[in-house]
Amino acid sequence: MAHTNKHYLDLPGSYFFTEINQRVNTYKKTHPEKSIIRLSIGDVTRPLVPAVIKALHDATDEMGQPSSFHGYGPEHGYEFLIGEIIANDYTSRNVHIEADEIFVSDGTKCDIANIQELFDPSDTVAIIDPVYPVYIDSNVMSGRLGKLINGIWSKLIYLPCTIENNFIPELPTQHPDIIYLCYPNNPTGTVLSKDQLTIWVNYAKKEGAIILFDAAYEAYITDPTIPHSIYEIDGAKEVAIEFRSFSKTAGFTGLRCAYTVIPKELKANTREGNEQYLNMMWNRRQTTKYNGCSYIVQKAAAAIYTPEGQKQIQESIQYYMKNALIIQNAITQMGITAVGGINAPYVWIKTPDNLSSWDFFDLLLQNAGVVGTPGVGFGPHGEGYFRLTGFGSYEDTNKAIERIQKALLI
């Protein structure tokens, strides 16, 4: 008889965002006359920009001709896209990255969940909290985090980000082997300065730890002093893997394209003390388990680096950031504490009157018809907080704010 992976049984009953959808659908069934505005799941709403659409059409036409048809592509990604990534995302910031250090994929979610396959199941994990749930769930599936006891994973090192520490995590007091950082941060919308990020790089060096750095929202940084890549920090190539995505940068949530950077000098040890290069290991993993992102999608991704593409995606980014700033300003004017919305499209709200995250969710759903994200879904230190996003339309964002103001009797 076949046996299941017992660690899957340790996962919570349903994926967090599924629970949100279930509550909303229940409300809609009992209140069919009510309109719902969603400022919850971080999906984009603006269409793909013209430069991307043209590239998709052109690449599709190529696939219809014998002379330009493409079958299986390179698992790393096509050179035409990798070259644009290097020139625009790294060389422009005085960071040297080589072509074989970039692995194009169909999504950061997949990569950041799969990367833990490279590490020993007994490695200790430190994760900022609150945080994107996939970091935790993927490690639960591998058995690294122990048991969930009163909302706390028994073997996980939590790095709290709360109002008390200005949402900047402190270095852990116990040794981690793997450290998850996400900046600009989802869900809090906060960032780390170069000095603050340097502290983490130096700490990882001292501890022999690996930083998994999720930079999916770097395109939303407006402060010129904030690093867009962890590799802007001296020595980071020795301790960090970086994850980037075109989903929020260029609206690719429905196309799926991303990339992961693993420097060739990045090493980890076996339990016997033998050094292994993680770039080689990930390459072996990808060539075994992955056939590459499609040619058509990679051509579309390359198009965002053209002058027209850059101009067009910046218009979309600025559109979303305008929405986020509207939310941030309105919430703070209500006398409610809120962070984010300046270097990220997320606004992180301290719930008023000490309401729980889910109670505040229900209040806004029932009284305003606005759907946000309960902070507790991002981890125990998200309890008492709530996330709203700038990814809606300008009209819906303003309408949602008006409804929230009325619901809170402001």
UniProtKB/Swiss-Prot annotation:
Its cofactor is pyridoxal 5'-phosphate. InterPro entries: Aminotransferase_I/II_large, DapL/ALD1, PyrdxlP-dep_Trfase, PyrdxlP-dep_Trfase_major, PyrdxlP-dep_Trfase_small. It catalyses: (2S,6S)-2,6-diaminopimelate + 2-oxoglutarate = (S)-2,3,4,5-tetrahydrodipicolinate + L-glutamate + H2O + H(+). Pyridoxal 5'-phosphate binds at residues 72, 108-109, 132, 186, 217, 245-247, 256, 291. One of its GO terms (molecular function) is pyridoxal phosphate binding. Substrate binds at residues 15, 42, 109, 132, 186, 291, 387. It comes from the Bacteria. It is an enzyme of class 2 (transferase). Involved in the synthesis of meso-diaminopimelate (m-DAP or DL-DAP), required for both lysine and peptidoglycan biosynthesis. Catalyzes the direct conversion of tetrahydrodipicolinate to LL-diaminopimelate. Homodimer. PANTHER family: AMINOTRANSFERASE. This is LL-diaminopimelate aminotransferase. It comes from Lawsonia intracellularis (strain PHE/MN1-00). The gene is dapL.
